[in-house]
Amino acid sequence: MNIKEAQAITHTLSKPGKMPGFAYSTPAHECKTGTILRDVDKSVCKNCYAYLRGRYRFKNVIDAQYKRFRSLTHPKWVEAMAAQINSKKVKYFRWHDSGDVQDLDHLRRIYEVCRLTPEVKHWMPTREAWTKDYSP
């Protein structure tokens, strides 16, 4: 799969300014746990940096995040993500500089992308505590 085909499936990767590599951001509005924790005082999600703050509030950023979000169940998502990450020749990749894991299928697909990108160190901070039970 070439990069143009991959981007047609997953949209482009994001490039957070404070990270040494690329990332894959989805809308903070769609966080399963974060949506609940946003209303809890002193929770880490209460003042979420990706929830309508900074560049995350711009329409073009939100549109890109929703394109990525809608792509998560595409049958070729894993292949497309691996192609894009491998093409960047980076050492590090961050999952969800905005957004979070949606469900077990999403988590398993991320693990498969990691398997297909062995030269890259993946980082996935999450508030979805259940994911710890499914480490590969």
Predicted regions and their residues:
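Class I S-adenosyl-L-methionine
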Residues: M1-P136
